[in-house]
Amino acid sequence: ADWRLLRSEGLLIGKVSSQDGENYQVQFQLFDVYKSQQLVGKRYNVPASGMRTLAHQIADIVYETLTGEKGVFSTRLAFVTEMKNADGSKRYALQISDADGANPRTVLQSRQPIMSPSWAPDDNRLAYVTFENAKSEIFVQELSTGKRQSVASFRGLNSAPAWSPDGKKLAVTLSKNGNPEIYVLELSSGKLSRVTHNSQAIDTEAVWMPNGREILFTSDRGGRPQIYKVNADGGRAERLTFEGNYNASADISP
């Protein structure tokens, strides 16, 4: 078939062959239709139990080949579910799953709300906020062992944990000295450093720049929520957004 007549830019061909009923050989080739060139092709031997994982890996390869950006098909989700008990009370569960929602697993259950799950770069730790001790508190939990540790339980608000690119620090929002400010917490030592200083504003929703030296955050110090940038070790904050009356929840493109 002439795939160009269908205006197809790419063509993916796959083949699965049974080797002994329990193991399979999987092949795929991705072609640029207009250039008549193979972009990538691979062959794998995999047991039946590994077929689903391999399918996600192949999807990642195809996506990155076509777009230049890493795929997310082999990643995992962290999310909070809210359920009602028979007596009408609520219970909460922090869960993780594959990117398509399959294989869900409960990490933590609580009668109190759970908020703001955040993945560590090593994909084995989650930071999150709980209210299980009658106040907001930030925990870090290892997924492989289930071990968890409270890392921020100060007076007032403890919220919005964000991992540094190297996984050694958390940027958090604390109100232990009055209004909410951005702090950086060094996990190995427990050292806490205040980053923002504005007694009249709410500073929150920190996100690290890839260089690990700068942090973006949301602040209403100008009257309405806008995005600002500041060095991770503190200093003068620079306003980045000016269009619109409400700009919040910054994110960094890959």
Q: How should these model regions be labeled?
A:
Residues 2-61:
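Amphipathic beta-strand/beta-sheet edge segments enriched in Tyr/Trp
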Residues 22-25, 86-95, 135-139, 179-183, ...:
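Structural motif
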Residues 60, 70-97:
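An edge-strand/N-cap motif at the start of beta-rich repeat modules
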Residues 71-73, 121-122, 165-166, 210-211, ...:
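Residue-level detector of Asp-centered blade-edge/turn motifs that repeat once per structural unit
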Residues 77, 123-127, 167-171, 212-216:
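Hydrophobic beta-strand positions that form the internal "hydrophobic ladder"
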Residues 98-115, 141-159, 185-204, 230-246:
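Multi-bladed beta-propeller domains
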